[in-house]
Amino acid sequence: MSHDLDPTGTY
């Protein structure tokens, strides 16, 4: 899960 604007679990 890679979020740019909303990192809710950047793995």
Swiss-Prot record:
The keyword Protein biosynthesis does not apply. Its main location: cytoplasm. GO terms for cellular component: cytoplasm; nucleus. Disruption phenotype: Simultaneous knockout of tal-1A, tal-2A, tal-3A and tal-AA is embryonic lethal. In embryos chitin secretion and formation of the cuticular exoskeleton appears to be normal. However embryos display a loss of denticle belts and dorsal hairs. Segment-specific epidermal sensory organs are present and segments form normally. The cephalopharyngeal skeleton is lost, and the head skeleton and posterior spiracles are deformed. In the developing leg, tarsal constriction occurs but the tarsal fold does not form. Keywords: Cytoplasm, Developmental protein, Nucleus. Induction: Polycistronic RNA up-regulated by ecdysone. Transmembrane segments: none annotated. GO terms for biological process: actin filament organization; morphogenesis of an epithelium. It comes from the Eukaryota. It is found in: Cytoplasm; Nucleus. The keyword Cytoplasm applies. This protein is produced by a polycistronic gene which also produces tal-1A, tal-2A and tal-AA from non-overlapping reading frames. tal-1A and tal-2A produce the same protein from different reading frames. One of four peptides (tal-1A, tal-2A, tal-3A and tal-AA) produced from a polycistronic gene that function redundantly in several developmental processes. Required in early stages of leg development for the intercalation of the tarsal segments during the mid-third instar stage and later for tarsal joint formation. Promotes the post-translational modification of ovo isoform B (svb) into its active form which in turn initiates trichome development and promotes tarsal joint development. This is Peptide tarsal-less 3A. It comes from Drosophila melanogaster (Fruit fly).
